[in-house]
């Protein structure tokens, strides 16, 4: 069973390995610094998908308001580690974000 939660700055250490998988050329300190800065932006949200207590997916997004559609969330990244890909977890994470929004 998987669970969904909004991630906070307390989760940065758990998020870093997934971002490293997406961007292996970055170093941990840069990722941590960038992530801390993003968490400080009021319209930023970060979402996690957990299998038991293990973070198996992360996505982030920006809450915006558009003249043509009103309030929305613009998803920035969806990261599912290679070991969990092709099992529907990415789709499930997007669906859970849609339900949250």
Question: Each PLM stretch: what is its role?
Answer:
Residues 1-15:
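A short beta-loop-alpha structural element at the N-terminal edge
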């Amino acid at each position: 069973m998987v669970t969904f939660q909004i991630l906070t700055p307390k989760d940065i250490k758990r998020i870093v390995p997934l971002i490293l998988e997406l961007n292996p050329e970055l170093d941990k300190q840069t990722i941590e610094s960038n992530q801390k800065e993003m968490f400080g932006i009021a319209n930023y949200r970060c979402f996690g998908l957990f299998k038991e207590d293990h973070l198996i997916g992360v996505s982030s997004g920006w809450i915006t308001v558009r003249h043509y559609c009103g309030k929305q969330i613009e998803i920035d990244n969806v990261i599912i580690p290679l070991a969990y890909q092709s099992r529907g977890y990415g789709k499930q994470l997007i669906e859970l974000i849609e339900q949250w929004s």
